[in-house]
Amino acid sequence: MQINKAALEIFDFTSSLAVYSEHELKIGEQDIHDYIAGHVTKAFKDPGARTGTLHAHSPMGKRIGEYKSGEISFITLAKELGEKTFDYMKQATVGVVIDTIVCDVVTDTNYICMLLCQAHDAFTHQLFSEDDGSLSTELVPHKAVLPMPTQKLRAFIAINTLDLSVRIFEPKGEYDGEVCYILADKVLQLGTDQSSRDTVKKVKTIIDKVAQAHESDGVAELTMAKSMIAKNAEVSDTVNPIRIVEEVFKSNPIQQEAAKKELAEQDMMRPLPVNREFATKVGEHHKIKTDTGIEISFPVEYMQNREFIEIKTNDDGTLRIELKNINKIVNK
């Protein structure tokens, strides 16, 4: 990843004060470059990110075009994006300091990214020399420490400067009494698809709901769905919920139609974007919990192989779980 340019802006919502830099960050310094690159890399993989596309004639779409053509500078673009963000957020955000990094990034293509880093309190050590020449150490508080790249950003925007496609994650906020996504709905004026996490969660919920409504525990259906999602991620960055429910309920047309009705109500009757790394992890394990408090986690593919695990119904209607071919048990 290459960071071409970056600018830092300070949003202090404790005092409703914003500071916009008139100079770029010194990204030639390796530590600064690596800090920004680390956050951007992690944010691109976030399964909570939603996707959409800016209209070329929208206010932000036009400014991105003007930046590409050299009509406006990077600092001008960063400041305008920052000012618009602060103006909308100040009504919905209180009591925090957010340092915002706007950067020009190249990965597979060129992006304008905005990283909202919520500051937090932290402590470090400091060495003091006493009057008698002895040394002492103290804990020193810092009131505005930024999150490390291993920690999640408060919000993130990545705008592809070629096709104006957008990846974005943010918490919901309230503006003029309306609960909304401030960055997507107000700053960018952008409609988005649901996130990978929401897509997978809704597919699983629908399959489980339909299965249990037709006197099944849903375990076999859910493990099949998770396996399909994971295998699909090997070749595609979209998932088709219709194909999944058709395959899971292929022997039961009534359940199939019930699941499709649920998908239609959730506006999921079409292929939806999905983070391939996240989708692959979804298919690794399945976890079940009994009404007696026992929890079991097992590889998804084991449900297709009765040599390892099998769920049976007893004569009295209760269930039993058989774990087979075990050579060793390890306490954890």
List where the protein language model places each region:
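C-terminal structured domains
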Residues: 246-332
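Long, hydrophobic alpha/beta structural blocks
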Residues: 2-282
